[in-house]
UniProtKB/Swiss-Prot annotation:
Binding site for substrate: R12, L13, S14, Y15, R70, Y127, R131, S135, R197, L198, H199
Binding locations of FMN: R65, T66, V67, L68, L69, R70, Y80, T81, K87, Q109, Q145, S146, W191, R201
Entry EC no(s): 1.4.3.5
Pathway(s) where this gene product acts: Cofactor metabolism; pyridoxal 5'-phosphate salvage; pyridoxal 5'-phosphate from pyridoxamine 5'-phosphate: step 1/1; Cofactor metabolism; pyridoxal 5'-phosphate salvage; pyridoxal 5'-phosphate from pyridoxine 5'-phosphate: step 1/1
Reactions the enzyme catalyzes: pyridoxamine 5'-phosphate + O2 + H2O = pyridoxal 5'-phosphate + H2O2 + NH4(+); pyridoxine 5'-phosphate + O2 = pyridoxal 5'-phosphate + H2O2
Cofactor note: Binds 1 FMN per subunit.
Protein name: Pyridoxine/pyridoxamine 5'-phosphate oxidase
UniProt record similarity statement: Belongs to the pyridoxamine 5'-phosphate oxidase family.
Length: 218
């Protein structure tokens, strides 16, 4: 074990891809996010819309997982899940979360923090019906999400059983326990890797309805 840790300590890169100055960024952090996000899309990165979602229980126990961004406006950043999942339980107890986008080939990351609310039911329904049919079926049978199941075979059998049951239906109803959340941002941090670990970090904090820009120590 000590040899592994020693080896890891030797693994390091010098960040040379870019720089980030106050004069270069938008006054609105969502516009700044869209600029970076569109750059990541244009660079053909693998799933640049994947993001880490950090939540915490009422007792302060943190949980983090990767989810997919499914909407981004000034009103907030959307993702969908089972309301009975660990993330759903956490958000019912403690409706604050943080998102992290990491684009290593661009040497960039973005943190977005804020209050989380459920997306209106009709919006969740509309999105559900845009999903592939098999993904709709999976949402029905994967409950409670994160619950224990005896085997992969049992999960597959439930999936196939429901496939057969609904094959004649044109529309499959959205499960009541499934839908969307919207993180309403009050904090952003944009990170650009720089040489010698003197990274650029610019934060936007919402104070009295206005965004305030600060440079942070690396």
């Amino acid at each position: 074990m000590s040899d592994v840790i020693k080896d890891l300590s030797e693994l390091r890169l010098s960040y040379e891809q870019g720089e980030l100055y106050e004069t270069q960024v938008a006054s609105n952090p969502h516009e700044q996010f869209l600029g970076w996000f569109n750059h990541a899309l244009a660079a053909n990165l693998h799933e640049p819309y994947a993001m880490s979602l950090a939540t915490a229980s009422a007792s302060g126990r943190p949980h983090v997982r990767t989810v997919l961004l499914r909407g981004a406006t000034e009103a907030g950043y959307d993702f969908y899940t089972n309301y009975d999942s660990q993330k759903g339980i956490d958000l019912a107890e403690n409706p604050y979360a943080e998102l992290l986008f990491y684009w290593p080939s661009l040497e960039r990351q973005v943190r977005v923090g804020g209050h989380v609310v459920k997306i209106p039911e009709q919006e969740s329904t509309d999105y559900y019906h845009k999903r592939p049919r098999d993904s709709q079926i999976a949402a029905h049978i994967s409950t409670p999400q994160s619950g224990k199941i005896e085997s992969r075979e049992l999960l597959q059998q439930r999936f196939q059983d429901l496939q057969q049951q609904v094959q004649s239906r044109e529309v499959l109803d959205k499960p009541e326990f499934w839908g969307g959340y919207r993180l309403q941002p009050d904090y952003y941090e944009f990170w650009q890797g720089r040489p010698n670990r003197l990274h650029d970090r610019l934060s936007y904090e919402k104070i009295d309805g206005q965004w305030t820009l600060h440079r942070l120590m690396p």
